[in-house]
Curated annotation (Swiss-Prot):
Pfam families, per the entry: HSP70 (PF00012)
Disordered, as annotated region: 622-645
Entry keyword set: ATP-binding, Nucleotide-binding, Stress response
SUPFAM superfamilies in the record: Actin-like ATPase domain, Heat shock protein 70kD (HSP70), C-terminal subdomain, Heat shock protein 70kD (HSP70), peptide-binding domain
Protein name as catalogued: Heat shock 70 kDa protein
Primary gene name: HSP70
UniProt record similarity statement: Belongs to the heat shock protein 70 family.
Statement: the UniProt record of this protein carries the keyword Disulfide bond: no
């Protein structure tokens, strides 16, 4: 590990909550934030004066719904026109627009309109997680392992990596969330198990859902198959409840709250709380005072109703499980352990669906909120050479989607089938489609459909300079190469001429350019400086406020008041009252103004207090809130001291 870079950390960048861990003293430490919470909301908010991230952003969301963003993970690496983005936008109070089919989030910040890409919002959450770790470890952190849903496609992975760069992190590795959870499970069980184990990780979080089937043996974690839905999670269960209660409010009060972001936000928060309560009780009451136009809303909600509202989504959770078993060519009876990860797996109905495994006991020994960060921290320690005795751990992950290229007639020709272990490299020879064809267009796709138009285009490039020849004669070798981060390089070579061309799939359509990333890194620095400026301002304001109120209390103290001449007391009272009323009307003043006001107030109060103490004989110590370096009393007050050469 390079000196001065601090330890490497593992970050679970979640849709709704994020978590950070570090390998220390031979174990993983999940780090609590400044509020004492071990998970931090993935929320970012902008107000008229400052930027808020984490708990502070989530706590003010009801007052400021349109300038608070959450769920950036549901936008990252996606196109604005995609159905998933369009359907989510209807539920978000913040404004979004498409810039060349890239979703942008619009905020009002300090009276100006600002646009941010999802990568920037995610980078702000990553910065927050980095700062939480730095505060705990007392050193600067540069290296991190960041997790993504196993079913994230190439562009979503690239965009997550970009977010890390903007946050000033060196993302050593992007690993899949269920694989990270499997590491946590594997280390937890290491002492008690021997032989090969087939483990199914069922990871249902706030916004994404993954299922992975792994074989674990002697520190080797081999992913056999993975499946999932990058747009299914706890948020969707909340949405169903919100929609249900919007209708109920309409029915009871003949009023529609769906156009009021603040009312909707308060309802969503209450629904989220109710959902959690219903995991441990059969019914609960939602209480919201003055939800809309002064009307209180206190509906009852039962677990049965919650399950009915979401039954189709719960059933949907089983499809990837079945697909995963099919792909791995494994029978459900061969699964030794089913591990639940993600907060949404606490829902009793989700746990019941596991009856699919014929009543197999579910493994709940690992914390579903922290398992992913735990595994990422272990991987970070291995990659940076810290977790020495863990270096016998080997991860064999897979690519979640088939990769191939378009051949004549729009057909998808697969070179790397889904669930192929990575890193991997595959070659195939292609030829021209017509006589004397001077070049070929290589179009790279990912997806499972037979025709390329139904799959996702990752990128394309041209191989030109092919000598004239009848169709089918030229031999063009196409190579697909996937690295450990699941990032794809494609190259094509004409065997006769040695002519070569290649592309690293960076999904140019939605990917940020180097220049844009540079600009965003600078912006991140700027926002950080602004955040520090705000903190300085708050500290200076608080110092002035404390001093003024301390001084007011000091002169109200009978012991002190009796020793102060009336005119001095009046002088202090006037100065303190003046400072407090100035504070009330100048909350947004600059640091210098607060400091000047403080000096002015000290200049009036300190000499009077010092004179009073000095008048009593040798100084008896300063009054409450008085500065050590206050000017000494006036002439004749107390003993004179001469300077000795």
């Amino acid at each position: 590990m390079a000196k001065g870079e601090g330890p490497a950390i593992g970050i679970d960048l979640g849709t709704t909550y994020s978590c950070v861990g570090v390998w220390q003293h031979d174990r993983v430490e999940i780090i609590a934030n400044d509020q004492g919470n071990r998970t931090t909301p993935s929320y970012v908010a902008f107000t008229d004066t400052e930027r808020l991230i984490g708990d502070a952003a989530k706590n003010q969301v009801a007052m400021n719904p349109t300038n608070t963003v959450f769920d950036a993970k549901r936008l990252i690496g996606r196109r604005f026109s995609s159905p998933a983005v369009q359907s989510s936008m209807k539920l978000w109070p913040s404004r979004h627009l498409g810039l060349g089919d890239k979703p942008m989030i619009v905020f009002n910040y300090k009276g100006e309109e600002k646009q941010f890409a999802a990568e920037e919002i995610s980078s702000m959450v990553l910065i927050k997680m980095k700062e939480i770790a730095e505060a705990y470890l007392g050193s600067t952190i540069k290296n991190a392992v960041v997790t993504v849903p196993a079913y994230f496609n190439d562009s979503q992975r690239q965009a997550t990596k970009d977010a890390g760069v903007i946050a000033g992190l060196n993302v050593m590795r992007i690993i899949n969330e269920p694989t990270a959870a499997a590491i946590a499970y594997g280390l937890d069980k290491k002492a008690t198990s021997s032989g090969e184990k087939n483990v199914l990780i069922f990871d249902l979080g706030g916004g994404t859902f993954d299922v992975s089937l792994l074989t674990i043996e002697e520190g080797i974690f081999e992913v056999k198959a993975t499946a999932g839905d990058t747009h299914l999670g706890g948020e969707d269960f909340d949405n169903r409840m919100v929609n249900h209660f919007v209708q109920e409010f309409k029915r009871k009060n003949k009023k529609d709250i769906s156009g009021n972001p603040r009312a909707l936000r308060r309802l969503r928060t209450a629904c989220e709380r109710a959902k959690r309560t219903l995991s441990s009780t059969a019914q609960t009451t939602i209480e919201i005072d003055s939800l809309f136009e002064g009307i209180d809303f206190t509906p009852r909600s039962s677990r049965a109703r919650f399950e009915e509202l979401n039954m189709d989504l719960f059933r949907k959770c089983m499809e990837p499980v079945e697909k995963c078993l099919r792909d791995a060519k494994m029978d459900k009876s061969s699964v030794h352990d089913v591990v639940l990860v993600g907060g949404s797996t606490r829902i009793p109905k989700v746990q019941q669906l596991q009856d699919f495994f014929n009543g197999k006991e579910l493994c709940k020994s690992i914390n579903p909120d922290e398992a992913v960060a735990y595994g990422a921290a272990v991987q970070a320690a291995i990659l940076s050479g810290e977790g020495n005795e863990r270096s016998d751990l080997l991860l064999l992950d897979v690519t979640p989607l088939s990769l191939g290229l378009e051949t004549a007639g729009g057909v998808m020709t697969v070179l790397i089938p889904r669930n192929t272990t990575i890193p991997t490299k595959k070659e195939q020879v292609f030829s021209t489609y017509s006589d004397n064809q001077p070049g070929v267009l290589i179009q790279v796709y990912e997806g499972e459909r037979a025709r390329t138009k139904d799959n996702n285009l990752l990128g394309k490039f041209e191989l030109s300079g092919i000598p004239p020849a009848p169709r089918g004669v030229p031999q063009i070798t196409v190579t697909f190469d996937i690295d450990v981060n699941n990032i794809l390089n494609v190259s094509a070579e004409d065997k006769t001429t040695g002519q070569k061309n290649k592309i690293t799939i960076t999904n140019d359509k939605g990917r940020l350019s180097k220049e844009e990333i540079e600009k965003m890194v600078q912006e991140a620095e700027k926002y950080k400086a602004e955040d520090e400026e705000v903190k300085k301002k708050v500290d200076a304001k608080n110092a002035l406020e404390n001093y003024a109120y301390n001084m007011r209390n000091t002169i109200k103290d009978d012991k002190i008041a009796s020793k102060l001449p009336a005119e001095d007391k009046k002088k202090i009272e006037d100065a303190v009252d003046g400072a407090i009323s100035w504070l009330d009307s100048n909350q947004l003043a600059e640091v210098e103004e607060f400091e000047d006001k403080m000096k002015e107030l000290e200049g009036i109060c300190n000499p009077i207090i010092a004179k009073m103490y000095x008048g009593e004989g040798a100084g008896m110590g300063a009054a409450a809130g008085m500065d050590e370096d206050a000017p000494s009393g006036g002439s004749g007050a107390g003993p004179k001291i001469e300077e000795v050469d």
